[in-house]
Amino acid sequence: MNIKPLADRVVLKPIEAEEKTAFGIIVPDTAKEKPQQGEVVAVGIGRLLDNGERAALEVAVGDRVIYSKYSGTEIKIEGKEYLILNERDILAKL
């Protein structure tokens, strides 16, 4: 994948929820919740500050993160699904 997000945007590969529950029940696609965890696959160069400097991002490629449920833009590249979102929509690193 060759994508370079702009400014403080981040590209994530969503980590899908388990197919089975702890009791072995298979969860159908219609009942699955939208993923809120992902792996960072690309980061922008940072947000431009008022003084002209760039604020470094707090996440890096390879980090596993939790993000807001309805944030970002879903895209498909080479048959794989990704999410582009602003760094501020990332809630925590795992």
From Swiss-Prot:
Give the matching SMART domains.
Answer: Cpn10 (SM00883)
InterPro entries documented for this protein: Chaperonin_GroES (IPR020818), Chaperonin_GroES_sf (IPR037124), GroES-like_sf (IPR011032)
Where is it localised?
Cytoplasm
Entry keywords, A to Z = Chaperone, Cytoplasm
Provide GO CC annotations from the record. Answer: cytoplasm
The GO annotation for biological process reads:
chaperone cofactor-dependent protein refolding
SUPFAM superfamilies linked to this entry: GroES-like (SSF50129)
Quaternary state and partners of this protein?
Heptamer of 7 subunits arranged in a ring. Interacts with the chaperonin GroEL.
Q: Which family does it belong to?
A: Belongs to the GroES chaperonin family.
Question: Its biological function?
Answer: Together with the chaperonin GroEL, plays an essential role in assisting protein folding. The GroEL-GroES system forms a nano-cage that allows encapsulation of the non-native substrate proteins and provides a physical environment optimized to promote and accelerate protein folding. GroES binds to the apical surface of the GroEL ring, thereby capping the opening of the GroEL channel.
Designated name of the protein: Co-chaperonin GroES
**Phylogenetic placement of the source organism:** Bacteria, Bacillati, Bacillota, Clostridia, Eubacteriales
Gene that this sequence comes from: groES
